[in-house]
């Protein structure tokens, strides 16, 4: 077994990369499964970028079928696949080490990245099926995943290129709904508003930019910008926007909140 980056953190060696030795799983939400995926993803990105020299050496073509595992605690490991059949959770691509010396290093890393992306999706939706996610939960999970750059995009540099292309067209408040919306709620604090309806379209450039800004606004919980006619609320601490229904805040309740903190910011303060 080849270790890497503090490997066994999420589930123990090649035994499924995060399974837990056959112990039953507690029910999880889409957000919890997403956090699991995000940790595994961070570990695999680390293996293919900052720890790439160590990863390259561990993938010796002379050894048996090796796999790259990512763990929920943002560590990674190169090791043999699980011995149990069927495995506790889906397995990553086998034999990533065999192609190492027959390809350009960048191409090989990109290939491993593609297979890693595929594995993350399979693990996430395995959990979705195991925990009985309904259509709405599966949609939330997919949208949250889709808002992250893929491992392939990070490893090949495509993620940075996309970010640079977006920057010139986005304002400093591109993550918030348009100022038209805020003007509708001037009697409220900046954190409380309803999502915009297409009003009085003036057709000028400024209006188009504001519309683009709102189109780019994503709910911090479900990761979508669906429900443009629904109530939204902004966290005064992290300035992320949320569907009211996702954080269980109604317009009536929002009227009495002087400073709103989202669940993530509230939990951080509690832990501190």
From Swiss-Prot:
Basic and acidic residues: compositionally biased ranges: 183-200
Q: What is the purpose of this protein? A: Histone-binding component that specifically recognizes H3 tails trimethylated on 'Lys-4' (H3K4me3), which mark transcription start sites of virtually all active genes.
- Site (Histone H3K4me3 binding): residue numbering on this chain: 232, 236, 241
Highest taxon, organism lineage: Eukaryota
**Low complexity bias: start-end ranges:** 168-182
| Biased composition range(s): Acidic residues | 201-214
Q: Which UniProt keywords apply?
A: Chromatin regulator, Metal-binding, Nucleus, Transcription, Transcription regulation, Zinc, Zinc-finger
- Where does it reside? Nucleus
Task: Relay the domain remarks.
Answer: The PHD-type zinc finger mediates the binding to H3K4me3.
The annotated region (Disordered) lies at: 1-24, 162-218
Please state which protein family the record places this protein in: Belongs to the Alfin family.
Q: Where is the composition biased (Gly residues)?
A: 1-23
Query: Lineage of this protein's species?
Result: Eukaryota, Viridiplantae, Streptophyta, Embryophyta, Tracheophyta
Q: What is this protein called?
A: PHD finger protein ALFIN-LIKE 6
Record's Gene Ontology CC terms?
nucleus
Q: Which GO terms describe its biological process?
A: chromatin organization; regulation of DNA-templated transcription
Organism the protein comes from: Oryza sativa subsp. indica
